[in-house]
């Protein structure tokens, strides 16, 4: 019987190895893999309930896709905090496993990209990209400059106002302007232009979406 012991041991090792391979085929665990998304939910106005309300939206959407164990923050600047200082240090992957940026410097040096700036389920945001559905919704609320700092006067009173006399700075998730233009600030994912007003996020190509980042 002793001569069979090594064979039995080898079989046990092989069985464990096969079990590990099977586990690896189940795909990434979203509780740690997902680190960035454009919110699938929208807002008709710039009143998001302040930073707390926006963060809560990010946390809820992340939880719905199995990533709620991470701490999520909205990429929004206010009079008291810059968006870049709220989102951790990276790296950040999207729902499809692609790296959006490895760190803050890389993040703020890049432009929008329809294939990377997707929602929490990996779906592209309607924009100016070829074949996009209508309506255009690539204007994402940020209230920020291109380097992630507050754009004074363009934060809808720190995301608590739906006033027609105020506006918000937005970025283009796809990095494109009309007719797929990439001139001027149009490619900016976080600071392309100001929207029409805080009373209505739809004109000019918006729907009140926000960017969400995992800070841990």
What is the predicted function of each stretch?
Residues 1-2, 21:
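Residue-level detector of alpha-helical transmembrane segments in integral membrane proteins
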Residues 2-9:
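Sec-dependent signal peptide recognition
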Residues 10-11, 209:
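Short A/G/S/P-biased low-complexity tracts
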Residues 14-17:
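C-terminal motif of bacterial Sec signal peptides marking the signal peptidase cleavage site
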Residues 19-216:
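Secreted/extracellular ectodomain signature
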